[in-house]
A protein has these predicted regions:
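Non-cytosolic head/periplasmic domains of membrane-anchored proteins
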Residues: 70-153
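N-terminal export/targeting and maturation segments
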Residues: 4-82
Length: 153
């Protein structure tokens, strides 16, 4: 009984802590960005190293802020919603599958959503954190894929 409980807990913690690493290696449909989604959903579990220009906020929602020179961009996750504020001040609302719901300028007027440009900005905001994720000692990629494959395809 204790062995099964211990193995279950280990598996749970492994999948949560290494979810970003696993998400980088899961086959997925273009535009779904599983590594970004897993980073934001599991930020309380994932490795969040000290990186110059990057700060983390986890008081009710999870947010990563990147300051580069005088420009600031923020990716926030709350409930089932991702919200990105670009360095230009535009805001983008996504569902948990990374599908854009709204695109607004700094005056809250609807603007055209330029997928490649916005995803590039989001990637620039969080990529240093994604790059810092450790490789698991015991790789459970097969189990992660089994659980999340349908979500990202």
């Amino acid at each position: 009984l204790y062995t099964v409980l211990g193995m279950s807990l280990f598996t749970f913690f492994n999948l949560k802590y290494h979810s970003v690493y696993y998400a980088q290696h899961i086959p997925h449909k273009e535009g779904t960005e599983p590594d970004i989604i897993m980073l934001m959903e599991n930020m309380g579990w994932a490795y969040t190293p000290e990186i110059d220009g990057i700060s983390y906020d986890d008081d009710g929602s999870y947010a990563i802020t990147r300051e580069k020179g005088t420009k600031t961009s923020i990716l926030d996750f709350s409930g089932d919603t991702l919200f990105f504020i670009s360095a230009s001040g535009n805001g983008y609302l996504f569902n948990r599958n990374f599908s854009n719901q709204y695109a607004l300028d700094e005056h809250y007027h609807t603007i055209k959503y330029k997928q490649r440009t916005v995803q590039k900005e989001i990637r620039e905001t969080v990529q240093p954190v994604i790059d810092a994720q450790p490789k698991p000692l015991i790789n459970l990629q097969w189990l992660f894929n089994l659980i999340y494959q349908s979500r990202f395809n």
